[in-house]
């Protein structure tokens, strides 16, 4: 996928590690033997098999798998429909739908990319249709989906690494992130509301909105 670029970068780093002490100036470092470099890369917690990789293989994989099960089961579309039914009628409702849908989906997926792909395919065209410009629509969706990484209970990979480095239960990190996550999405909500007011946008028409009761019945 990456091609030879990564191979070249690794080769340059190895060459620099072995012969970098011969360089004069600020780029110079103390002399390292090849055996020391190999030992440091493969047998210490700061090398390739480090704490972040261990956490990823042990804990993050399980939560990602759980989130994918929910997405495949239709939870993603359910959250989108629920957001449209709840927020679509308000001023600038399309953008607010994107925010709410991304925040809810963020509770089961800590991946900003997966969040964007799942919700953006629906919310970005909807925002453009209701009067938002394309670049603004994409920005709202990207920022909303990125916030899913700090939305408990399933956050981004960094949250698991933080818990591992600090030696505290993951739940403490998740609880500490509740207030920042709420403030993050509230600020984003007010931003799109002010933009909608300035542009004179209105909510979606009643016939375009799904009924809340129908959405809940279908989802459960």
What are these regions (language model features)?
Residues 1-65, 82:
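Hydrophobic transmembrane alpha-helices of multi-pass solute/ion transporters
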Residues 7-8, 57, 95-97, 174:
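Hydrophobic alpha-helical transmembrane segments
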Residues 47-55, 170-176, 213-218:
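Interfacial loop-to-helix junctions that mark the boundaries of transmembrane helices
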Residues 54-64, 171-187:
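Alpha-helical transmembrane segments
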Residues 80-148:
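Hydrophobic transmembrane alpha-helices that form the pore/transport pathway of multi-pass ion
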Residues 105, 137-159, 175-191:
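Membrane-embedded alpha-helical segments of transport systems
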Residues 157-170:
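Transmembrane helix-loop junctions at the membrane interface of multipass transporters and ion channels
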Residues 175-220:
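Long, contiguous bundles of hydrophobic transmembrane helices that form the permeation core
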């Amino acid at each position: 996928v990456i091609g030879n670029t990564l191979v070249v970068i690794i080769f340059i780093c190895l060459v620099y590690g072995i012969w970098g002490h011969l360089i004069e100036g600020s780029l110079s470092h103390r002399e390292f033997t090849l055996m020391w470099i190999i030992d440091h890369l493969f047998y210490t917690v700061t090398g390739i098999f480090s704490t972040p990789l261990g956490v990823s293989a042990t804990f993050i994989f399980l939560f990602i798998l759980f989130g994918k099960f929910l997405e495949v089961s239709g939870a993603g579309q359910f959250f989108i429909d629920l957001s449209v039914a709840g927020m679509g009628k308000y001023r600038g409702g399309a953008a607010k739908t994107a925010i709410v849908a991304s925040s809810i989906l963020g509770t089961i997926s800590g991946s900003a990319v997966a969040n964007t792909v799942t919700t953006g395919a629906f919310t970005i065209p909807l925002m453009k249709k209701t009067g938002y410009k394309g670049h603004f629509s994409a920005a709202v969706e990207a920022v909303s989906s990125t916030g899913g990484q700090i939305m408990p209970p399933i956050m981004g990979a960094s949250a698991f690494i933080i818990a591992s480095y600090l030696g505290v239960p993951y739940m403490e990190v998740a609880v500490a992130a509740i207030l920042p996550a709420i403030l993050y999405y509230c600020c984003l909500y007010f931003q799109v509301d002010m933009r909608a007011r300035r542009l004179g946008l209105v909510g979606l028409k009643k016939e375009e909105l799904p009924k809340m009761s129908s959405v809940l019945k279908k989802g459960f």
